[in-house]
């Protein structure tokens, strides 16, 4: 059985690497029609792959030798499978394809946004740099331009959201859940806490963190010399604006390498591998999807970091965050 599991795992790695590469190529350039077609094709394949995967997971979870297998591969793997199995049934295959299509539509729409501001053309990522500038009017103006886009595209965005909510609620009910929240906890493999735990956590945040947050906002307003902190002020903590990293990409990478060299523990060699192998796409550009993520190419044992640098401290924060994911995945 263990040998069969290893063969299955290798097949999953190969399929997973293909799906990861397809998603990466799509998010790198949402205007690339070939990349979009590949993404659509992989979305259509995914439910069938999940169905085959689930059959094997069910067989292993119910296997007579489960206790012996857990000693070999650990019990956590079986806990994750028990969470994943109830989240799929062939009855929702078409719904999953539609869900992926809606996600692609949203990604393409937001990636297409262009903002003319401060004599430059910006996307959703680069317009965000103004939130950390010292000039309050500039901060406010950038936010107005950005949110005007959401207002102009509100009908399409609302339609996508409405369709997605109803689609997911329908999937949950087809699978026997009351709503998508119950399904969502299983899909995210939350095997060590539940809705009740999160509800208690929210209460604690409201009781202890929110009052502290209000105090910090008051102190921030005093630091900035304003009467009240508005939403276009929230990212700034100094009258002079926030400290900015080097604006040259190569200089940023050099400083990152220096930092990891000082830390050691394998981070230095790992980052050099990431740089030399081209396993990073960090600069924002037209047509590129927003946000940041880390994914893994399991067949070659290397992760990939996707981000959108915009010239603020957030570049450093997002990058080091994703590097943590990447290094953990690489070492494990």
Outline where the language-model segments fall.
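Active-site-adjacent "gating/activation" loops or surface patches in catalytic cores
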Residues: 125-137, 245-320, 324-329
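Hydrophobic/aromatic-lined pockets within catalytic cores
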Residues: 165, 210, 214-217, 221, ...
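A well-structured
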Residues: 1-243, 255
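Short, hydrophobic/aliphatic alpha-helical segments
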Residues: 157-169, 274-278, 304, 330-332
